[in-house]
Swiss-Prot record:
One of its GO terms (molecular function) is endochitinase activity. The keyword Signal applies. Residues 90-127, 182-222, 287-333 are annotated as: Disordered. This is Probable bifunctional chitinase/lysozyme. InterPro entries: CBM5/12 (IPR003610), CBM_sf_5/12 (IPR036573), GH18_Chitinase (IPR052750), Glyco_hydro18_cat (IPR001223), Glycoside_hydrolase_SF (IPR017853). Residues 198-216, 309-318 have a biased composition (Pro residues). GO terms for biological process: chitin catabolic process; polysaccharide catabolic process. The active site is at E700 (proton donor). Residues 95-111 have a biased composition (Low complexity). Residues 586-877 form the GH18 domain. Residues 1-24 form the signal peptide. The gene is chiA. It is found in: Periplasm. Residues 25-91, 128-194, 229-295, 337-403, 459-529 form the Chitin-binding type-3 domain.
Length: 897
């Protein structure tokens, strides 16, 4: 079986056989910059949500912390910790429990200056050169005074490695290691910050991105060789422009204001983002114009918007007319509008506030209010775009004050074990809300916890060949230890494997001297008394069986069940997402939308402009592996997600969505929810509150072989289907599975066989026709030969045979109608696999011939040209090979009722 190691919200959704991760993983080491990092800290993997500073520590990050960009993704595996290291402290970066972490020959540069801890060896494909006042956004490895340095972000020629200090936010050079004798010999080893050769005066700096000082920069724009050139006319925003000014072409390196003039830009000017690129051609000047003055802007102030500070007490109401307002130069028609409601994140938002439309120029916090903003206010990222139309105010609303209404959302107090709670009390515990169904005494159940009594079993001697899982106890030399997670061959008696406080990634918790009882002590243990307050590790007897208390406990017997259940506050959600106007089509093109990306397309605009009316939203997963709480990608709650306005607008336009639960990464609800009834209720509530007609379960990665979650899911789906039937509701269920050209894997067939055995009625089986990892599907540089398309149609043909065997009473047409195919457009995760437009045409022909139930793609955000590598935001082909939404143009006609 192939295991998927990709995060679907970052790249794709297919099974991977032999591919590198989308993000290079490393131990946390004070990373700084606008790049996307994936780091290991204290046994967990974190990713930065926006620009990160070296002083931001993952260990201090919280789920919605606007001051810390690190976000917890999952627990690191033992292999990852072994390979990349495991930083344990915010105070000393680079400390690792792994002996395999890279350590430099010296942690002190040759010049004796302070240095950042080593960041590993120089990659084999990177050359080491002498420091020569390099400038730009590319990555250099330079020799200076006997040491090798690497720039952590955009570097200026005035930045000298000799001046760099640990965590220095003003100097991007970071010490890597001591230089070798060969490197010193070949580079001449510059030793002075003033003696390096001066860069040629006629060479202008490369148009690289440098963060503006003292502000959170917007996500780096991706430049394209085929950029559009326009005349400078006071452009404003975070889009990337190439403008003509006084015979030269300039590009903005970060957010640019209308008052920033290219003519005022200097080489290292941190106050002006314009950077010289090259001389404009005569044709470009003739075609686009050539403004030469900073004081005279053509075309009515050059199209620049002069910010207005409307008075909140007197809301601005535009005069209705039949004309649409002029669109700002940096507007993106494929992204949607919404009322301001305290949006937070690095996504680009277009919001309505007090009669106007605003757009954030960089990362925005929930406390940043559009009122009073201006281009000169570097502390507030909101920028006025235009006046909202009457239709927009009617559709999206018009907040006029900076007070954020929580929409009736319940705010719960933190759980206290020493406190008693009445029935229906709601508490907050580990960033989740729980509600108790009965009165709860002090020192009772902990929300989300197991019964505090554990059946007594003499701890067995530890064995190196035995696999231990969480909760298993062993004895070594008279000392007891408890496994904190899966472990094998890790001797608990070794300090290197011990985790006394739960603060590192080691597997064993020391418990002290092993408890052992004689038969007489066990038989004469005191009988359980609910009125007694028991200390932890107390032996009792209950119904003839001995138990040990795992915590302080009272009025809870070993047979009681935990009355606390995860509580999701769905207040107002049904209204936020709107109601579909039409039935879900029997044959539909429903591309996947990574609904946790920073740049989610405007679904209504796609319906209007590209005839794509149905989408599959991905992915709802558990908050973490141990918390039975649905979230969007672990990052966003279900109740008041800011992106719901996109669903409502799509439904108003006549389209609809289905939702996908699961994915390759993070824990599915079926894994974290051990109680089938709890799992069933979550499925019911998701469908009910998001007004869904179709629900998809994406089962892949390790979860396609996890029997416990497979069985829980199928049992819960059967239960919720029975409930829907009793209420007269017809909700379609699809299972999405990985596939090979030869058909489903044995694990995938097991999922379907178990579903059938438990009575689950599937509307369809969608397969991920991508990332096969098979030599016959290698298709790079074979455009037009339809290699990847043939692998997809072969997979569908073999799936048909497998489903026919599972459902012998269904006709061929019925089997075809319950199949779906979802390729990954463009460059796939598996190296050498590429899905071209010609492949799409072949897949479309096969889908129409068979009359399949569904066609999808991973993903709609990737249906854009750009780059040559993997990305969540483009397909890796040129615009000549596949223009914007070219794959959707092929597949969109597939939809029919």
């Amino acid at each position: 079986m192939k295991l998927n190691i990709f995060t679907k919200s970052m790249i794709g959704m297919g099974l991977v056989c032999s591919a590198l991760p989308a993000l290079a993983m490393e131990a946390w080491n004070n990373q700084q910059g606008g790049n996307k990092y994936q780091v290991i800290f204290d046994g967990k993997i974190y990713e930065n949500a926006w620009w990160v500073s070296s002083t931001n520590c993952p260990g201090k990050a919280k789920a919605n912390d606007a001051t810390n960009p690190w976000r917890l993704k999952r627990t690191a595996t033992a292999a990852e910790i072994s390979q990349f290291g495991n930083t344990l402290s915010c105070e000393k970066s680079g400390s690792s429990s792994s002996s395999n972490s890279n350590t430099p020959a010296s942690n002190t540069p040759a010049n004796g200056g302070s240095a950042t801890p080593a960041q590993g060896t120089v990659p084999s494909n990177s050359s080491v050169v002498a420091w020569n006042k390099q400038q730009g956004g590319q990555t250099w490895y330079v020799v200076f005074n006997g040491a090798v340095y690497k720039n952590a972000w955009w570097v200026a020629s005035s930045n000298c490695p000799g001046d760099a200090k640990s965590n220095d936010a003003s100097n991007p050079w970071r010490y890597v290691r001591a230089a070798t004798a060969t490197e010193i010999s070949e580079t001449s080893n510059p030793q002075s910050c003033t003696s390096a050769p001066q860069p040629s005066p006629d060479v202008k700096p490369a148009p690289d991105v440098k963060p503006a000082p003292d502000v959170q920069p917007a996500p780096a724009d991706k430049s394209n060789d085929n950029y559009a050139v326009v005349a400078w006319k006071g452009q404003e925003g975070s889009s990337t422009w190439y403008v003509i000014y006084n015979g030269g072409i300039y590009k903005n390196a970060w957010w640019v204001g209308a008052a920033n003039c290219p003519g005022d830009a200097k080489e290292n000017d941190a106050s002006n983002p314009w950077r010289y690129v090259r001389a404009a051609t005569a044709t470009e000047i003739s075609q686009y114009g050539n403004p030469g003055s900073c004081s005279v802007k053509p075309d009515n102030n050059g199209g620049a918007v002069t910010p207005v500070d409307p008075t909140p007490e007197t809301p601005v109401t535009p005069t209705p007319d039949n004309s649409e307002p002029s669109t700002p130069a940096d507007s993106v028609n494929d992204y949607s509008l919404q009322a301001w409601s305290g949006q937070e994140g690095s996504e680009i938002y277009h919001v309505i506030f007090n009669g106007n439309v605003y757009k954030n120029a960089w990362w925005v916090g929930s406390k940043d209010c559009p009122r009073g903003t201006s281009a000169e206010n570097s502390n507030n990222p909101w920028r006025l775009e235009r006046t909202a139309t009457a239709a927009e105010l009617s559709q999206y609303g018009n907040p006029t004050t900076c007070e954020i209404d929580n929409g009736g959302v319940i705010v719960a107090d933190g759980f206290q074990a020493s406190k008693a709670y009445s029935a229906d009390s709601i508490v907050d515990y580990n960033d989740a809300h729980y509600k108790t169904s009965v009165d709860q005494d002090a020192w009772g159940f902990v929300p989300g916890g197991d019964n505090p009594w554990k059946k007594y079993e003499p701890a067995k001697a530890w064995s190196a060949s035995t696999v231990y899982v969480k909760g298993d106890r062993v004895v070594v030399d008279g000392q007891a230890y408890e496994a904190l997670f899966w472990t094998q061959s890790d001797n608990p008696a070794l300090v290197a494997n011990q985790n006394a406080t739960g603060s590192n990634s080691r597997p064993w918790k020391p418990l002290g001297k092993a408890q052992s009882y004689s038969n007489e002590e066990l038989n004469n243990a005191p009988q359980f008394n609910p009125e007694t307050l028991y200390a932890s590790d107390t032996l009792i007897r209950f119904n003839g069986v001995n138990y040990i208390s795992q915590s302080k406990v009272q009025k809870v017997s070993p047979s009681d069940s935990n009355p606390w259940r995860v509580f999701v506050d769905w207040t107002g959600t049904k209204e936020r997402v709107g109601t579909p106007k039409k039935a879900w089509p029997k044959h539909v093109y429903a591309p996947y939308v990574d609904f946790t990306l920073n740049t989610i397309p405007d679904l209504a605009a796609l319906a209007k402009n590209h005839n794509v009316n149905h989408f599959t939203l991905a992915f709802v997963v558990s908050k973490d592996a141990n918390t039975c709480l649905p979230t969007w990608g672990t990052a966003y709650g279900m109740q008041n997600y800011a992106q719901y306005s996109k669903i409502k607008a799509l439904r108003e336009a006549g389209g609809d969505v289905m939702l996908s639960i699961g994915g390759a990464n993070n824990a599915p609800l079926a894994a974290s929810c051990k109680n089938v009834d709890d799992l069933m209720q979550h499925y019911y509530d998701i469908v009910d509150n998001l007004n869904l007609k179709v629900l998809d379960f994406d089962i892949e990665g390790t979860w396609v072989a996890d029997q416990a979650s497979i069985e829980r899911r199928n049992l819960a789906v059967k239960k919720v289907q029975d409930k829907w039937k009793s209420e007269g509701k017809d909700i379609a269920i699809w299972y999405t599975l990985p596939i090979l050209p030869t058909g489903l894997t044995p694990e995938g067939m097991n999922v379907l066989s178990d579903a059938k055995a438990k009575g689950v009625e599937l509307a369809g089986v969608n397969v991920m026709t991508m990332d096969y990892g098979n030599a016959i599907c290698q298709s790079a540089n074979t455009e037009g030969q339809n290699i990847h398309g043939k692998c997809a149609t072969s997979a569908i043909a073999n799936l048909h045979s497998q489903l026919k065997g599972l459902h012998p009473n269904k006709s061929d047409a019925e089997i075809d109608a319950m199949m779906g195919t979802t390729p990954m457009v463009g460059v796939n995760d598996v190296q050498g696999e590429v899905f071209y437009l010609s492949d799409a045409r072949l897949v479309m022909q096969d889908a129409q011939k068979r009359n399949l139930g569904m066609v999808g793609i991973w993903s709609i955000a990737r249906d854009l040209p750009g780059g040559t590598n993997l990305s969540p935001e483009f397909h890796g082909l040129t615009k000549e090979q596949a223009p914007k939404y070219a794959f959707s143009e092929i597949f969109a006609p597939f939809t029919k009722q």
